[in-house]
Structure formats: C-alpha cells, structure tokens
UniProtKB/Swiss-Prot annotation:
Catalytic activity reported: an acyl phosphate + H2O = a carboxylate + phosphate + H(+)
Protein family (similarity comment): Belongs to the acylphosphatase family.
SUPFAM superfamilies xrefs: Acylphosphatase/BLUF domain-like
Keyword Hydrolase: yes
Record-level Gene Ontology MF annotations: acylphosphatase activity
Chain ranges of the Acylphosphatase-like domain: 13-101
Protein name: Acylphosphatase
Organism from which the protein derives: Aeropyrum pernix (strain ATCC 700893 / DSM 11879 / JCM 9820 / NBRC 100138 / K1)
UniProt gene name: acyP
Record keywords: Hydrolase
Active site: 28, 46
Disulfide bridge map: none
Pfam families reported for this sequence: Acylphosphatase (PF00708)
Lineage start: Archaea, Thermoproteota, Thermoprotei, Desulfurococcales, Desulfurococcaceae
E.C. number: 3.6.1.7
Length: 101
C-alpha cells in the first residue's frame, strides 16, 4: 500500500538458530563479515550441542532479510539442515557485530 512503511524499511531484530554442519566451517566469522557488510549489529555464537549456531541481529528490515537468506546456505563448507527465525522488538543495544564464545 502506498504511504505505509514496510518491514523492509523498519528497524528490526531477529534471533536466528541454524542447525547442521555449521561449527568448524567458519560460519561465525563468515556471518560476522556478511553482517558488517550489510550494516547489521549483533552477535553470533556456537551452541554446546556441536551442531548449532545462534545469532541475534538488528538493523534495517531488508538487511535482516538478506542475512537470513545468507544463513540458509552459510559459507561454502557449511551444510544447513534447519533454520529458525524469531522476530523480536528492536532494542538498538549493539554497536558492531561480535563473535561470542
């Protein structure tokens, strides 16, 4: 609809869970690089199960959509089996994008 802002133009926050062969394949470093390229802030970390990566990203809706699409494939050695995304209220709490341990 004309005159109605879309989610793509809004500031949004998403919690992303990726499962599969996503640890030990440079997923976190590659995601950080992609997030910074897209102007997103937040963090990414491995989960202790050995097969999952969790991330929280904030930024423009179109950039968040792009990082979600990127997560479907990940870096070349990754094999994504499952992707879950939860939208959360934007908080603006991050400066930059970090890898958490």
């Amino acid at each position: 609809m004309e005159g109605v802002p879309s989610v793509r133009d809004s500031l949004v926050r998403a919690r992303i869970l990726v499962r599969g062969v996503v640890q030990g394949v440079f997923f976190r470093a590659s995601m950080r690089e992609e997030a910074l390229r897209l102007g997103l802030s937040g963090w990414v970390r491995n989960l202790p199960d050995g097969e999952s990566v969790e991330a929280v990203v904030e930024g423009r809706g179109d950039a968040v959509e792009r990082i979600i699409c990127w997560c479907l494939r990940g870096p070349p050695a990754a094999r994504v089996r499952e992707l879950r995304v939860e939208l959360e209220p934007y908080k603006g709490e991050f400066r930059g994008f970090e890898i958490r341990y």
